[in-house]
Design a protein with these regions (language model features):
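Short Pro-Gly-centered beta-turn/loop motif in secreted/extracellular proteins
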Residues: 89-108
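Short acidic/polar inter-strand loop motif in beta-rich domains
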Residues: 113-122
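Processing junctions and N-termini across compartments
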Residues: 18, 42-44, 87
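Secretory targeting and sorting signals
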Residues: 1-24
Length: 144
C-alpha cells in the first residue's frame, strides 16, 4: 500500500511540475482603422490614397505591427497584420488593416512598408470591442 501511495504521489507531483506557468492569450480578429488627415496623397486604382512623408509605409503591400500599449516604443510585439484597403472620405485618407491579436486595452501601432521602411510608433492607442462585424472582435482606431 505504501508503494501505491508513493507512486501516486510521484505521478501527482510530476503532473504539477509539468503544468505550464503561463496561459497563452487567445487571439481574436482585430481591425486597425487609420485616419490620416495630413501626409497623404490621392492615387488611382483599387486604393484611393497612400501615406506620404513619415507615413509613406501606409499603402498596399504594407503591414501593421501591434505591440503592447506603453509609453516605451520598444514594447513587445504581439501581432502583425496586412493592409486591406484605403479610401478617401470627406478629405481624410482612411486605411484598414486586418490581423489577429490578443485582447488588450491599448496597443502601440507602427506601419512597415513593402520595402521594410518603418513609420513612427503611435500610441498607446485604446482598443474597442466590436459586436457588429463577424470575425472581428476588437478595433484599434489611429487618428494621425
Amino acid at each position: 500500500m505504501k508503494r501505491l501511495a508513493f507512486g501516486l504521489a510521484v505521478v501527482a507531483s510530476a503532473g504539477v511540475g509539468a503544468a505550464p506557468t503561463a496561459v497563452a492569450q487567445p487571439m481574436v480578429g482585430t481591425a486597425v482603422y487609420v485616419q490620416i488627415r495630413q501626409s497623404f496623397a490621392p492615387v488611382d486604382g483599387d486604393d484611393q490614397c497612400v501615406g506620404t512623408a513619415t507615413l509613406e509605409p501606409v499603402r498596399r503591400g504594407s503591414s501593421v505591427v501591434l505591440s503592447e500599449g506603453a509609453t516605451a516604443t520598444d514594447s513587445p510585439k504581439v501581432a502583425v497584420g496586412r493592409f486591406y484597403r484605403s479610401r478617401l472620405r470627406d478629405g481624410v485618407c482612411e486605411a484598414l488593416y486586418i490581423t489577429s491579436a490578443p485582447i488588450k486595452p491599448t496597443f502601440n501601432v507602427q506601419f512597415a512598408g513593402p520595402g521594410g521602411e518603418l513609420s513612427p510608433t503611435f500610441g498607446p492607442t485604446p482598443s474597442e470591442p466590436v459586436t457588429y462585424q463577424p470575425g472581428i472582435e476588437q478595433i484599434v482606431r489611429v487618428g494621425i
